[in-house]
Amino acid sequence: MDDSPGELATEDIQPEKLPPFPQLWIGYLIGLANAVAGFVYASLHPQAAKEEFPIPPLYLFLLIFVGWVYWLVCVYRYHEIMRRVPGWKHPISPARAVGFHFLLGYNLYWSFKWPREIAKFVNWRFGKIVMKPEMVGLMFLAAYVLHFLFDPGLGLVMLFLGASYLSGCLRRAFALGPLPTLSTPPSTE
């Protein structure tokens, strides 16, 4: 077997040997709790909405923080799954996948880059373009915009919508039978 990126043995990918997928319902729950708490706070304190840089109360801050941390746990888990696919060399380590989310500005590019690398695997497994990484990247970008301009909870829900699409594509790719070894995955562009 060749060690170059994109090589996969003819053996079947057995999902039970891979780490479990992230539990996205937890992220949805945190996001919805955050949105509800934010709307309740805004209705009880309407003057806070008029401030130029409103500072959230501690309970809202903690919900935002926990949601963001859980999002990073999910990103780490996706890349850990990809790292452990037999014969597949995933170019992004789990730590790097999480770390680049902290680089202001670069994280916007990163929200398009890492789904593209996962899409290469998914599309290679199907032998055709099935996963569109631009869709995931746009959902992540919309989530950032929602988070900063409207409501952090709704932004978090949008992040997990993108993750649901990504999970669905990965699950379908892992459910396929074995494929013969090909030289490179198809382009996602």
Where are these regions (language model features)?
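Membrane-interface extramembranous regions at the lipid-water interface
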Residues: 3-59, 66-145, 161-189
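Extracellular/periplasmic helix-loop-helix junctions in multi-pass membrane proteins
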Residues: 146-159
